[in-house]
């Protein structure tokens, strides 16, 4: 007890300078609440309770620091673990209606429901008496500079300087099926009709809350790392550009995409495994540009499979991949006739009023029903996926069925009919599941095999670099050097051609290094690039001179964040773009070589692990090699800062890694702009919702047939409800759709599937574009693992009255039988 008291008082004295006037009252409260004897198991819970009381007295920053420091001291005394680890997860789904999706830049692709939900997943790692590193993986197309700035602002308000832009990395999985409008530069929000505040807020709130969870879960633990090959989850979609790399370089690699997955396994000293994060290169484009349901695509699906597997692994003993099954359901051996008779007593319930918490409380994975131990967190992170497609069957012409042109990805000279095919072709949902399942299987294998424990320093370095005018030193083959410069951002003609994952429109083609007079005329109406800019980007013909377009505000970024997070011999390179396969290899190899020659004793023996976290802390499109850039396929045309962009990245990351291992301070560099106050939006708000006369919100429009009996693994059940716009309430950490199973004993309904399950789809629609009426269709594709019994489908929503008040509602279908 004396040792514990000493540590608490020492920790408190560290925080004393922040809030001297609270010292007496806070110390008294601490002594009053301190139990006479604290067990090892109870210490974390007691501290969390204590911190909650302190927050109620407006001491959030003081006592959050106190909690963190006290935990560090406890770790020193009671644990032999190398690190403190904490994981967190939070809903970032955002608006499921009316908002353009980010990724394909197709104005017709507007959200109208949910395939499954999006999440922010976080890990925090720290040494005793050291600052932590934070990594957040978000189910979004990419990280956003303005989102990152806002998250850091909030973290500083809560924790002081504990979490800053230097040690917090935020990376996107690159799904093309999430709400857009959350980036701050004009070119990325044109198709979303400007800035979408709901998308932005959902991301900022979710990222912040996932970090808060991880911080509150900080406990002694260990980290293990594992690597392995996954061969069937990605193909190179620009092989002609890859082949332009030097043959001697290509000969060093077996494949034209990176096949290695790197996985971290987090093990709590008391709770055992609590999470895993892995990095693997494949695009989030299993879902096509015709899809309108919010989805985490293949990486989000893999994360859902992994998290559900872990939560169910003790209940389910099977060699097959588990599906979502509620562990509290008991399988009664009722006859089919008995089940039908039982179901007949439960007809559809009319729509009725509900509360906001109704949806959250009924969620299958509701935190309201969790035990003391936090849920398992598994993230499938993005890396150098720039030229890697999940559509592994190849690209074919829609009209002829023949392979597309190799060099230009065209069909009869045009790009619009050339599409890549996923393994579930023509079903994009099946392709998403299959590619996700393949990543899940490999991650599970690596998770079970992970035996190399990470040990050593936790550190970080971060810098802002102006890539519009960066001096880059090139080393020639003869040993001489030349200084060149990067360019202000610009996009080439082939950018508008799109890719085989999502072709563009009009007569643009990949591999175009000339352009054409008509589109030059259109370009010049916006901004005519000057000769110096055209020479700098050569051989890219400039279609949009975005780096020099500033009205109504900047069209493209110029100042980018580069960051390295270190955990022992693992180095995470946070890059604000999509590196191609070979570009990523060159960056990793350059940093690894720099680290090996640093003289750091920790790095002298064993393997150094270097992973690239793509689309991190901001977004600046693609990064190709110099040789790939010459071909001017989509990726080269989208390399914003010219042919020497990659060399600039390598130069700056070598500097960062040198400063990191030598313990030197890095100058922060020029600060990026905060354009939040300049944002404009043309997305119309929800005015009101209505129903036909006599109907209520939540009423069933199309019910299940009477005496319906369906089979597991093959049948689909669909119910249509009177609904309202999902933008009225995003139901964050809730659900719009629910499948419930009847408990025979007490006639209660148990939630078994919700809108975060791959088998359940929530589809929302209006009869006309500006109609105040809408309906929700909930489709349940009954999985093989569903238990036989009596089921019903329930819908939750929120309706807006003419004068702004929002009323929550719910409704349920008639019961039916699953056999």
Where are these regions (language model features)?
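Intrinsically disordered, low-complexity proline-rich regions
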Residues: 9, 25-26, 35, 333, ...
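Leucine-biased recognition of intrinsically disordered, low-complexity hydrophobic segments
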Residues: 2-4, 9, 27-31, 47-50, ...
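Short, Lys/Arg-enriched N-terminal segments with co-localized hydrophobic residues
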Residues: 38-52
């Amino acid at each position: 007890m004396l040792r514990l008291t000493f540590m608490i008082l020492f920790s408190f004295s560290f925080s004393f300078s922040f809030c001297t006037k609270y010292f007496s009252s806070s110390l008294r409260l601490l002594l009053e609440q301190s139990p006479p004897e604290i067990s090892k198991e109870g210490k974390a819970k007691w501290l969390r309770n204590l911190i909650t009381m302190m927050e109620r007295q407006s001491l959030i920053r003081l006592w959050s620091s106190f909690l963190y420091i006290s935990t560090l001291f406890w770790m020193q005394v009671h644990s032999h673990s190398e690190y403190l680890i904490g994981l967190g997860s939070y809903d970032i789904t955002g608006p499921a209606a009316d908002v353009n999706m980010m990724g394909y830049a197709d104005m017709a692709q507007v959200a109208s429901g949910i395939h499954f939900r999006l999440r922010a997943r976080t890990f925090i790692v720290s040494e005793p008496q050291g600052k932590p590193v934070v990594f957040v993986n978000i189910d979004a197309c990419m990280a956003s500079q303005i989102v990152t700035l806002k998250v850091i602002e909030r973290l500083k308000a809560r924790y002081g300087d504990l979490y800053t832009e230097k040690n917090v990395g935020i990376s996107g999985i690159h799904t093309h099926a999430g709400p857009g409008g959350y980036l701050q530069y004009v070119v990325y929000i044109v198709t979303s009709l400007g800035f979408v505040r709901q998308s932005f807020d959902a991301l900022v709130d979710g990222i912040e809350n996932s970090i808060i969870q991880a911080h509150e879960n900080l406990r002694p633990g260990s980290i293990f790392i594992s690597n392995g090959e996954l061969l069937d989850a990605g193909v190179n979609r620009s092989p002609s550009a890859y082949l332009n790399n030097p043959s001697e370089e290509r000969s060093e690699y077996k494949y034209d995409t990176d096949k290695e997955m790197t996985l971290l396994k987090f093990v709590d000293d008391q709770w055992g495994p609590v999470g895993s994060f892995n990095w693997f290169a494949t695009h989030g484009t299993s879902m096509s540009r015709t899809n309108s349901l919010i989805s985490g695509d293949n990486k989000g699906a893999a994360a859902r499979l992994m998290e559900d597997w872990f939560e169910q692994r003790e209940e389910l003993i099977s060699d097959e991949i588990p599906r979502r099954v509620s562990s509290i359901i008991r399988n009664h051996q009722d006859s089919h006739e008995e089940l039908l008779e039982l179901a007949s007593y439960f007809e559809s319930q009319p729509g009725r009023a509900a509360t906001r918490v109704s949806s959250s409380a009924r969620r299958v994975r509701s935190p309201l029903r969790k035990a003391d131990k936090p849920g398992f967190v598994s993230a499938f992170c993005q890396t150098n996926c720039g030229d890697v497609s999940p559509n592994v069957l190849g690209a074919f012409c829609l009209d002829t069925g023949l392979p597309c042109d190799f060099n230009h990805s065209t069909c009869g000279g045009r790009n619009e009919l050339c599409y890549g095919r996923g393994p579930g072709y023509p079903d994009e949902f099946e392709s998403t599941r299959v590619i996700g399942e393949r990543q899940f299987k490999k991650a599970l294998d690596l998770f079970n095999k992970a035996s190399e424990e990470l040990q050593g320093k936790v550190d970080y370095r971060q810098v802002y670099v102006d890539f519009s005018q960066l001096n880059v030193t090139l080393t020639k083959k003869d040993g001489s050097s030349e200084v060149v410069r990067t360019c202000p951002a610009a996009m080439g003609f082939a950018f508008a051609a799109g890719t085989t994952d999502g072709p563009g429109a009009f007569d643009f083609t990949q591999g175009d290094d000339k352009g054409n007079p008509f589109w030059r005329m259109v370009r010049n109406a916006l901004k005519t690039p000057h000769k110096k800019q055209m020479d700098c980007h050569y051989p890219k013909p400039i279609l949009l001179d975005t780096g020099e377009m500033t009205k109504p505000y900047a069209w493209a970024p110029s100042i980018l964040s580069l960051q390295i997070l270190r955990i022992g011999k693992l180095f995470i390179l946070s890059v604000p773009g999509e590196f191609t396969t070979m570009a990523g290899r060159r960056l990793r190899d350059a940093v690894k070589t720099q680290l090996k020659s640093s003289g750091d004793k920790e790095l002298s023996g064993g393997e150094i692990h270097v992973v690239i976290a793509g689309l991190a802390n901001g977004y600046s499109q693609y990064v190709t090699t110099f040789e790939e850039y010459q071909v001017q396929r989509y990726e080269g045309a989208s390399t914003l800062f010219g042919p020497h962009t990659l060399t600039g990245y390598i130069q700056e990351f070598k500097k960062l890694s040198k400063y990191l291992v030598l313990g030197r301070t890095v100058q922060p560099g020029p600060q990026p702009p905060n354009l939040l106050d300049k944002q404009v939006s043309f997305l119309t708000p929800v005015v009101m919702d209505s129903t036909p006369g006599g109907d209520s919100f939540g009423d069933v429009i199309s019910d299940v047939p009477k005496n319906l009996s369906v089979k597991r693994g093959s049948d689909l059940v669909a119910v249509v409800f009177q609904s309202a716009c999902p933008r009225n309430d995003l139901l964050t950490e809730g659900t719009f759709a629910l499948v419930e199973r009847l408990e025979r004993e007490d006639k209660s309904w148990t939630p078994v599937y919700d809108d975060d399950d791959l088998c359940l789809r929530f589809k929302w629609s209006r009869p006309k574009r500006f109609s105040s009426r809408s309906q929700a269709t909930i489709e349940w594709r009954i999985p093989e693992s569903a238990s036989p019994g009596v089921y019903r489908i329930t819908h939750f929503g929120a309706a807006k009255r003419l004068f702004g008040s929002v009323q929550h509602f719910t409704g349920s279908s008639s019961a039916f039988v699953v056999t």
